[in-house]
Amino acid sequence: MTATIIDTDLLTQARSAVETAQGVIHTGIATAKESGTADQDQQLVYSLAHAASAAAMAESALTYAQTGDDEARLAHVFIGRQLTDLASMLWARSSDWGVEPSALDATRAYAAQVTAPAFVGLAAAAPGSANLPDDLAMVATTFRQFANERVAPYAEAIHRHDLDIPQEIIDGVAELGCFGLSIPEEYGGSASGSEDDYMAMVIATEELSTASLGAGGSLITRPEILARAIEAGGTDEQKQQWLPAIASGETLCAVAVTEPDFGSDVANLKVSASPEEGGWRINGVKTWCTFAGRANALMVLARTNPDPEAKHRGLSLFVVDKPSDDGHDFRHEVNGGTLEGRAIATLGYRGMHSFEVSFTDWFVPAANLIGGEEGLGRGFYLQMAGFENGRIQTAA
């Protein structure tokens, strides 16, 4: 890092701007509470939540800005863009937030300065230091080397020809412990329960993605989601059965939530799981199930309560075992049921392949209902516990 000559005046302006933004957001939240219409105005609630998250990140950026000149420029650009986004939210709906349209005017000069092309260009030319402790810096170095040596040589061919990810990459990622970054040590993973667990996962994802998103960084997402769901609501037996296998890479995972007619509108999902002796029969179609071919375990969100009024409370989460398949399609007939998948052509996200998966009377043992009997109706909540971690990884 070069000698630090941080512009303290600009930093003071940034701090004042963030405080102004936080005040506007707090007023908006209070206004929404007082109106009693939050349930009816989900767009407003979403905007407030988005703005509050952005303001919290901007506040953290103020600390980062004090570590060096390059870091300060990056922080200023980030804060300026968050202020610009907030201003656009207020432009048409300031009255709903309980503030005047001019509420952010005091921040305009600062935002204009730090989002100007010349200023942004300086920030882009000097990305700054990651400021990682030694152990996490080693994580970055290890995965950067793996990405350069083992992933990058295959990346172009995988993308241009929509090839499968070579087993060499999957085995290498498993050997590095990638699939167990968020799985507790007692189940064969490396998570110790500290915030560094998240950082290690984010760093590994970033480094692998520099070589290839589809054939590197995104390999970790599905194991993260399923493992977190099992940790959040699985029985002790299920944790012992599945978590070590996920951590080692023996079990490769895919997620089956989205449906053709409903997207991710979870409350109205239709894929059903009907009880029968010893287990369940699943029927319906899921789509955008990335890695569903190669995976030998699908996390499936299905409706176990047929009453449509049950909405998201009528959903349960299953681990559906299947054979691992190469290529762009698969079909299996077992126990009187059929499981069939076809890859969906995608523009830039190749290697793992995203599938449409059809279940016809596909049998799932009772032991594969996450949480057992206590997991009935908890599928949405367990899925969200998984997605919470998976989305952090996806953002990386």
Predicted features and spans:
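Amphipathic, small/basic residue-rich leader segments at the start of a protein or domain
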Residues: T2-A38, Q42-A49, T63-Q66, G98-I220, ...
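Glycine-rich beta->alpha junctions and the first turn(s) of the following alpha-helix
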Residues: T2-A56, G128-V139, N335-A396
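Short secondary-structure subsegments characteristic of cysteine-rich extracellular domains
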Residues: A58-T84
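N-terminal glycine-rich flavin-associated loop
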Residues: G216-D236, G263
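A short, Trp-centered hydrophobic/proline-enriched beta-strand micro-motif
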Residues: G249-V257
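Glycine-rich phosphate/pyrophosphate-binding beta-alpha loops
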Residues: S264, T287-G293, N389-Q393
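A structural signal for short hydrophobic beta-strand segments in well-ordered beta-sheet cores
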Residues: V271-S274
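A short core secondary-structure module
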Residues: N283-G337
